[in-house]
Every structure is written in structure tokens, then in C-alpha cells.
Amino acid sequence: MPAGLICIARIGAPHGVRGAMRLWSFTAEPLAVMDYGPLATKDGARSFEIATARPAKDHLVVTLKGVATREEAERLNGLELYVPRDRLPPTEDGEYYHADLIGLPAITPAGEPLGRVLAIHNFGAGDIIEIAPPQGATLLLPFTNAVVPTVDLTAGHVVIELPTEIEGDTPNHPEA
């Protein structure tokens, strides 16, 4: 991702036949996505201006200037939209943007290295932090205060308290 860009929204499926579409806003107040001017694709090749927006169940329904048909809206499904960081308000103490965490070392409360923050996901049930250990599969953990008790941007790390029980596949043992 180009330096200084923050993803603030993702376009979803069309809504109706006149070019409206679902939009998932990643701003604290969903309608604030309209306050940051034109939104661009990650590579900066395309730029979009929100013409109208209204809240829906867990997303916004928006129209974009220049998008007038369902077919045009369908072609945009899944696009992430970015703004330069300097258009966003500064963070307050204890606040951060998800982009600030990507690449930070993840350590245990004892200071032992676990890996690096690879991504923050949200599949609908809350934020998930993805940790890439030095070897092996990535860890997908709930981004909660219990699992991530400390985000220290000054020290440049996150503290991860690994859950004592992690559900997963267990080997089948035939009964003897």
C-alpha cells in the first residue's frame, strides 16, 4: 500500500437498479466517510466521490458520482477505498488506526516474541488480529482487551495474551 494511505471503506454489492451500492465504512461514525473528500483505490488509479449516503442495517447505502446503473455498481463490488492519512483527524491518547499496527512486533506479556502483526480483519463478529509467527501458520485471534491488553505505539509493539483454550481440529482416536 502506498505510504500514508488509510483504508476507510469497502464497496459491497449493488442496492437496487440505479447505481446505489452497499458501503462498509471503517470510520468511527459511519457517515463520516463523506467528510474526507474523494476516496481512491489502493493504487490511486480511480477516485470516487460519494453523492448520497444513508444508514442501513450494518452498512451504508451510497451513490457515487458517475455511477448510474446496477451494472456499473457491480463492477465496483469489493473495492477498498483509501484517503491520505493527513485528511483524517489525529488520534487521541490510546487511539490508533489499524494501519499503525501492521508490521509491529507481537510479544507475550513476558516480552517473548510471537511474530508480527500481519492484518486486522473483521468478518462480521468483531475485529480479528492476524499474527505471523517466525515459522508455522498465522494466528487469528480476537482483537479484544483480554487477548490484546496492550497496544504500545511508542515502544512499537503489541502485547498478545494467548488464550488458554483454542478450538480447532483434534485428531480422531479410534476407540479400542
From Swiss-Prot:
InterPro entries (alphabetical): PRC_barrel-like_sf, PRC_RimM, RimM, RimM_N, RimM_N_sf, Transl_B-barrel_sf
Primary localization class, coarse: cytoplasm
Compartments it resides in: Cytoplasm
GO process annotations (BP): ribosomal small subunit biogenesis; rRNA processing
Keywords per UniProt: Chaperone, Cytoplasm, Ribosome biogenesis, rRNA processing
Ranges annotated as spanning the membrane: none
Domain PRC barrel: 93-170
Claim: rRNA processing is one of the keywords in the record: yes
GO CC terms: cytoplasm; ribosome
Signal sequence interval, chain numbering: none
Entry GO MF terms: ribosome binding
Domain of life (superkingdom): Bacteria
Assembly notes: Binds ribosomal protein uS19.
Function text: An accessory protein needed during the final step in the assembly of 30S ribosomal subunit, possibly for assembly of the head region. Essential for efficient processing of 16S rRNA. May be needed both before and after RbfA during the maturation of 16S rRNA. It has affinity for free ribosomal 30S subunits but not for 70S ribosomes.
Family annotation (HAMAP family): Ribosome_mat_RimM (MF_00014)
Protein family per UniProt: Belongs to the RimM family.
Record comment regarding domains: The PRC barrel domain binds ribosomal protein uS19.
Stated name of the protein: Ribosome maturation factor RimM
UniProt lineage: Bacteria, Pseudomonadati, Pseudomonadota, Alphaproteobacteria, Hyphomicrobiales
Primary gene name: rimM
